[in-house]
Amino acid sequence: MKVSCVSTACFFALGFVLHAQMHRAEQDREITYWLQAPQTHQFRISHDFNVTRLGQSSVHSFVRKGSIVSASAIYDLDTGEKLPVHNVTGKAVNALGYYPAPSPDDMVVVQGDLPHPLAAGESARVRVIETYTDPESYRISNGELTWDRTLARPRNTVVLPAGWFLTEVTVPAIISLDPDGRLMLRFNNPRNDEIHVVLKAKHR
C-alpha cells in the first residue's frame, strides 16, 4: 500500500539524525544514494565495508543488473589511499573463491586492488563511491521523478536532488534535511530480505 508523504505512516523529523558510535564491523550496514537530476537517470552511491579473509587481495562492488556503473572509486579508509579499480566479470570473481554465493558469470563487478594480500588477523576497511545510470529504476514523467529500487541493507539513505520535494513513498521513512538543504529519507530494514521502495517527487 502506498504511503503519502503527509500521512502519519511517514515519519517526519526536521533536523539531522545523529548516530551513536558503532563498532567498526557494524558500520557495514549503511548505504547512501544521492539522486542526480532525473533527466540523467543517475544516482551516486556510497557504502563502506570490511574484508578480513586471509590472503584476500581485492575488494568488490557488485553492479545490479540493468544499471550502468561509472566514476567508480574505492578508498582504503585506514590509509586514505585510492585503490586501483577496474571492471571484471562475475565469472572472474567467482574464480577467486572469496564469496560463499556465486555471481552470474556475466555480472559487472567493480574491483579494487588492495596494496597487499591480507595477513592473518589483518582487515581492510574500504569505501565505494560510484555512479549508476538506470533509466528503468530512475525516471521522470510529467514533471514528477520516480525512483524504484529494492534495498537490502538495514539502514538506507536516499537524498533527493536539490529543489525537489517528496510527493509519495511506499515505505515509512524518517525525513530530514542534509547540510545542503536537500530532502533526505532514511529507510530502516529490520528484515533479512529486501524492502521495495518507490518514491516520487516534484520540483518546487
Feature roles, as predicted:
Residues 29-31, 43-47, 58, 110, ...:
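Hydrophobic residues positioned within well-ordered beta-strands of beta-sheet architectures
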Residues 21-63:
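Early extracytoplasmic/domain-onset interaction patches
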Residues 57-95, 148-172:
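Solvent-exposed beta-hairpin/edge-strand motifs
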Residues 71-74, 80-146, 178-204:
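A surface-exposed beta-strand-loop module
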Residues 7-17:
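Bacterial N-terminal signal peptides
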Residues 28, 42-44, 55-57, 69, ...:
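Extracytoplasmic
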Residues 1-5:
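Positively charged n-region of N-terminal signal peptides that target proteins for export
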Residues 26-30, 34-36, 107-113, 117-120, ...:
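Non-catalytic C-terminal accessory domains or segments of carbohydrate-active enzymes
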